[in-house]
């Protein structure tokens, strides 16, 4: 797992969900651990798409439940 991507994702998640950066770990679940609702999740996906200049299809977004899932998806898209 790329440390650079992980740190950037954690920063975006912290900002989007208004949680302390220290609370965001690679295994943090957006809804269960960080209190995101469905709208938060949509906004988070949009922020990740913009930050990494990628497109996350709805089907893929549904499978991204944790910070680590997001990092893995971004790494695969960025090659």
UniProtKB/Swiss-Prot annotation:
GO terms for molecular function: acyl binding; acyl carrier activity. Residues 3-78 form the Carrier domain. 4'-phosphopantetheine is transferred from CoA to a specific serine of apo-ACP by AcpS. This modification is essential for activity because fatty acids are bound in thioester linkage to the sulfhydryl of the prosthetic group. It is found in: Cytoplasm. GO terms for biological process: lipid A biosynthetic process. Signal peptide: none annotated. Keywords: Cytoplasm, Fatty acid biosynthesis, Fatty acid metabolism, Lipid biosynthesis, Lipid metabolism, Phosphopantetheine, Phosphoprotein. Transmembrane segments: none annotated. Its main location: cytoplasm. Pathway: Lipid metabolism; fatty acid biosynthesis. The modification O-(pantetheine 4'-phosphoryl)serine is found at residue 38. Gene3D superfamilies: ACP-like (1.10.1200.10). GO terms for cellular component: cytosol; membrane. Belongs to the acyl carrier protein (ACP) family. Carrier of the growing fatty acid chain in fatty acid biosynthesis. HAMAP family: Acyl_carrier. This is Acyl carrier protein.
